[in-house]
Amino acid sequence: ISGINVQTGADCALGLHNYSPIQGQQEPMDINQSVRFALTEYQGYTPRKWDNGKDAEEYEEFREHLPEMIKHAVEGLKDFFDGVNRIEGESMKYHDEPLLDVPIMLYQDYSGGGKQIDLKCSLPMRNPPKKDGTRTWRVPKPKTEPTAQQVMQQAVYWKATGEKPALLFVTSAGYNIVDENNCELMTEDNL
């Protein structure tokens, strides 16, 4: 749910909340209003109770990191789409592959200007409890290499849309854009 809330906040800041291909990009909210909107949605989640408080503990910790993650996601998206007139938000699309009996359904996170990017969020990870019972958390750095599954996903998106793929890795420590310019796995030969 936290990754969804990061995307919600970024969508609001870019005018892509409630996106539809017919309406397109709307008037954006300012970043603080976008963060408040995403946090309000986040607070609608009720942590599960059957896991000895693990989900509730993560819920509280993740809430503290969401504002920075949203801000980094917006910075990364603005960086990636610099000079692009119109950005499209997430919507359901279909791709007909002649070798398959059914169409492939895909949800591109963001696209425009002949390129597309998929948002990937990494949340803080819990450290073991200290002797006094308290816990600290480790904030990961944004990833620099995609997983095999992420490369396969981007290959399908590229084949379906013809738009050059990229990945936006976001943590509360920053963001990293991975594309064909800085990662061999994202080049045409590997996709």
What are these regions (language model features)?
Residues F80-G83, G112-Q116, A160-A166:
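Secondary-structure boundary elements
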Residues R36, T136, K164-A166:
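Ser/Thr- (and often Asn-) enriched beta-sheet segments in non-cytosolic proteins
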